[in-house]
Swiss-Prot record:
PROSITE patterns: RIBOSOMAL_S8. Pfam families: Ribosomal_S8. GO terms for molecular function: rRNA binding; structural constituent of ribosome. InterPro entries: Ribosomal_uS8, Ribosomal_uS8_CS, Ribosomal_uS8_sf. This is Small ribosomal subunit protein uS8. Belongs to the universal ribosomal protein uS8 family. Part of the 30S ribosomal subunit. Contacts proteins S5 and S12. Keywords: Ribonucleoprotein, Ribosomal protein, RNA-binding, rRNA-binding. GO terms for cellular component: ribonucleoprotein complex; ribosome. It comes from Anaplasma marginale (strain Florida). Gene3D superfamilies: 3.30.1370.30, 3.30.1490.10. It comes from the Bacteria. GO terms for biological process: translation. The gene is rpsH. One of the primary rRNA binding proteins, it binds directly to 16S rRNA central domain where it helps coordinate assembly of the platform of the 30S subunit.
Length: 132
């Protein structure tokens, strides 16, 4: 099965998993999704993740979701740039998500990183998603 937008599929699986109060969700493996998960783990939005393979050899990422007082830690996660409409921004024009309470995840020439790190390094890129 080929996905036209694996990032949107990943974000939807996270949202649906948290809406159903699931402890874990499985997402198809890709380099970009793994980079986003590294960022979410470092920022404390998820408990952790591991790489697993099914018997057919397909790689999946097992994501352990995080809750606080029986409520999901991720309040809102939205896809910004999509295949039909890419959204790029320079370092000085990178917006703030929820007035700085949330973060944007940006794909830059130096890899996938958070918006405030991209501003600090002075590099722009494609705004992948916002997390609050």
């Amino acid at each position: 099965m080929s996905l036209s937008d694996p990032i949107a599929d990943f974000l939807t699986r996270l949202r649906n998993g948290q809406a159903g109060m699931n402890k874990v969700v499985f997402v198809p493996h890709s380099k970009v999704v793994r980079s986003i998960l590294d960022i979410l783990l470092a920022e404390g939005y998820i408990e952790g993740f591991t790489e697993e393979s099914k018997s057919s050899g397909i790689k999946y990422l097992k994501v352990c979701l995080k809750y606080y007082n029986c409520a999901p830690v991720i309040k809102k996660i939205v896809r910004v740039s999509r295949p039909g409409k890419r959204v790029y921004s320079s370092a000085d024009r990178l917006p703030k998500f929820y007035n700085g309470l949330g973060v944007y995840i940006v794909s830059t020439s130096q890899g996938v990183m958070l918006d405030y790190r991209a501003r600090k390094l002075g590099i722009g890129g494609e705004i992948l998603c916002g997390v609050f």
